[in-house]
């Protein structure tokens, strides 16, 4: 486990480049900062300033090396590196509320933006007119879209929203791709087609994730539940009410294992039993370390004023937390190995810190932990 504190401000979202040498983060404002690793240090190399509202989503396309950002100013920008400068291209999303999340499609020929306008904007580049255009997925979304994730086939899109639903839509754009092959989710996939909708009312859906095979989708909700739907099991849904505070982010690390994190400030493991179609709690992944009590320095006291609105170091303010992160974890991303066999994943949090977790090290540190 490696932890680096970038900022006093919360990190609201992040994205990595292809070779994992650079990370783009939003310091909870209208800017995006790009840091590059140099030895054991992280040095700021770029600042992307074009939004005039808080940046709410970042995604970095690995092959084309383009960054897409969205924000509360209701716009998205596609950033292209020309020389040593990132050049922005405005994408008109045609929404009247804040954009909340953005994701490149696997083939990088389009991206999706979820918003408070109760729509998902599917944006693609129109060669004839030399600009980005978008189509809207509207029905039956009834509230803000908080999270998105793409199926490996580049067509299906999972969305979690504030109307307590996880849905899977077809985002097929005939202008930029061939007709998709049938999937376990369905064979007819015209644009905007609803392929799946969760029936349980479980709270705001903060995070969604497809498995590596694309036949499973997991989501986490504000009532501390974790759910998984398996298309190979006739859309059977496994639900687990966890004992944690609400989880904000989730990702598959194998076909049967999930890592999620949120307001408890540490990642937890969940395991899916394919035969029984059930989810079980696999354990906490952040091993508490016994540390001796000591006095606070003046520097730490001022940092606590910024991070926790308190100069005291008690448990209520987070200094007494035995977790690596001292505030809510806002995002999880797979660093190496992919969703099929993840070997490293990354978390960023509202404490302004970033942690890199090694799966094998976690397995050896936690003797009872077995990641299937």
UniProtKB/Swiss-Prot annotation:
Instruction: Report each WD repeat as a residue range.
Output: 6-45, 50-89, 94-135, 140-179, 242-280, 324-367
Q: Which SUPFAM superfamilies would you find in this protein's record?
A: WD40 repeat-like
Q: Which InterPro entries match?
A: ARPC1, WD40/YVTN_repeat-like_dom_sf, WD40_repeat_dom_sf, WD40_rpt
Q: Where in the cell is it found?
A: Cytoplasm, Cytoskeleton; Nucleus
Any one Gene Ontology MF annotation carried by this entry is: actin binding
The UniProt function text for this chain reads: Component of the Arp2/3 complex, a multiprotein complex that mediates actin polymerization upon stimulation by nucleation-promoting factor (NPF). The Arp2/3 complex mediates the formation of branched actin networks in the cytoplasm, providing the force for cell motility. In addition to its role in the cytoplasmic cytoskeleton, the Arp2/3 complex also promotes actin polymerization in the nucleus, thereby regulating gene transcription and repair of damaged DNA.
Name of the featured protein? Actin-related protein 2/3 complex subunit 1B
Source organism (scientific name):
Mus musculus
* Gene assigned in the entry: Arpc1b
């Amino acid at each position: 486990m490696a932890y680096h504190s970038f900022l006093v401000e919360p990190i609201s979202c992040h994205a990595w480049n292809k070779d994992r040498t650079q990370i783009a983060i939003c310091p909870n404002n209208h800017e995006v900062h790009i840091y590059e690793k140099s030895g054991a240090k992280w040095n700021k190399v770029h600042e992307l300033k074009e939004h005039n509202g808080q940046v709410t989503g970042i995604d970095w396309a690995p092959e084309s090396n383009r960054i897409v950002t969205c924000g509360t100013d209701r716009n998205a920008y596609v950033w292209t590196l020309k020389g040593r400068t990132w050049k922005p291209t405005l994408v008109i999303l045609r929404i009247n509320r804040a954009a909340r999340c953005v994701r490149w499609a696997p083939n990088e020929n389009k991206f999706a933006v979820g918003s408070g306008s109760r729509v998902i904007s599917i944006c693609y580049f129109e060669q004839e007119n030399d600009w980005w255009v978008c189509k809207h997925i509207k029905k039956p979304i009834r509230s803000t879209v908080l999270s998105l994730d793409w199926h490996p086939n580049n067509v299906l899109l999972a969305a979690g929203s504030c109307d307590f639903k996880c849905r899977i839509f077809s985002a097929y754009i005939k202008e930029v791709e061939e007709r998709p092959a049938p999937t376990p989710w369905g064979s007819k996939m015209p644009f905007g087609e609803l392929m799946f909708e969760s029936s349980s009312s479980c709270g705001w859906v903060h995070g969604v994730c497809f498995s590596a095979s694309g036949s499973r989708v997991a989501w986490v909700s504000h009532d501390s539940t974790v759910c998984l739907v398996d298309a190979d099991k006739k859309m059977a849904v496994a639900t687990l009410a966890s004992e944690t505070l609400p989880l904000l982010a989730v990702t598959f690390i194998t076909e049967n294992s999930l890592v999620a994190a949120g307001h408890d400030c540490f990642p937890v493991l969940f395991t899916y039993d394919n035969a029984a179609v059930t989810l079980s709690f696999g354990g906490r992944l952040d091993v508490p370390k016994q540390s001796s009590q000591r006095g606070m320095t003046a520097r730490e006291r001022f940092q606590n004023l910024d991070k926790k609105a308190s100069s005291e170091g008690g448990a209520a303010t987070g200094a007494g937390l035995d977790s690596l992160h001292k505030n809510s974890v806002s995002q999880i991303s797979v660093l190496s190995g992919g969703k099929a066999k993840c070997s490293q994943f990354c978390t960023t949090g509202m404490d302004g810190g970033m942690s890199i977790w090694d799966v094998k090290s976690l397995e050896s540190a936690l003797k009872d932990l077995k990641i299937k």
